[in-house]
Amino acid sequence: MIQSFTRLAVADNSGAKELMCIKVLGGSKRRYATLGDIIVCSVKKALPNGKIKKGQVVKAVVVRTKREVQRDNGSLIRFDENAAVILDSKKEPVGTRIFGPVGREVRYANFMKIVSLAPEVL
């Protein structure tokens, strides 16, 4: 459950380290984002030589949440941190590597490049 002002870790090697959610995309009254949703973020911490700089506004897809997500079969999945992968204008990941597991809901949201780069899909 990601909402405005939520801080997220970055799960790729784009150069950003921490994001802050500004807006959840998908409707004017939409408050929360979950696995596979696109959010607009501000970069709060970044590496000095990375592709993404501090203060930049970027779009990202949520790949891990602390809040549990209920699957269709009734099972629950949750992670130790909130994390996202930064996207470019064509909804492809900016980084070339993905760190840590990603939820299966990312595949259902048609982010196949992220799923193929991820070391584990839970």
Curated annotation (Swiss-Prot):
CDD domains: Ribosomal_uL14
Gene Ontology BP terms: translation
Subunit details: Part of the 50S ribosomal subunit. Forms a cluster with proteins L3 and L19. In the 70S ribosome, L14 and L19 interact and together make contacts with the 16S rRNA in bridges B5 and B8.
This protein's encoding gene: rplN
Protein name: Large ribosomal subunit protein uL14
Family named by the database record: Belongs to the universal ribosomal protein uL14 family.
InterPro entries: Ribosomal_uL14, Ribosomal_uL14_bac-type, Ribosomal_uL14_CS, Ribosomal_uL14_sf
Pfam families in the cross-refs: Ribosomal_L14
GO-annotated cellular components: cytosolic large ribosomal subunit
Gene Ontology MF annotations: large ribosomal subunit rRNA binding; structural constituent of ribosome
Keywords of this entry: Ribonucleoprotein, Ribosomal protein, RNA-binding, rRNA-binding
Stored PANTHER family: 50S/60S RIBOSOMAL PROTEIN L14/L23, LARGE RIBOSOMAL SUBUNIT PROTEIN UL14M
Domain of life: Bacteria
UniProt source species: Campylobacter concisus (strain 13826)
Protein's UniProt keywords contain rRNA-binding: yes
Keyword Transmembrane attributed: no
Function as written in the Swiss-Prot or TrEMBL entry: Binds to 23S rRNA. Forms part of two intersubunit bridges in the 70S ribosome.
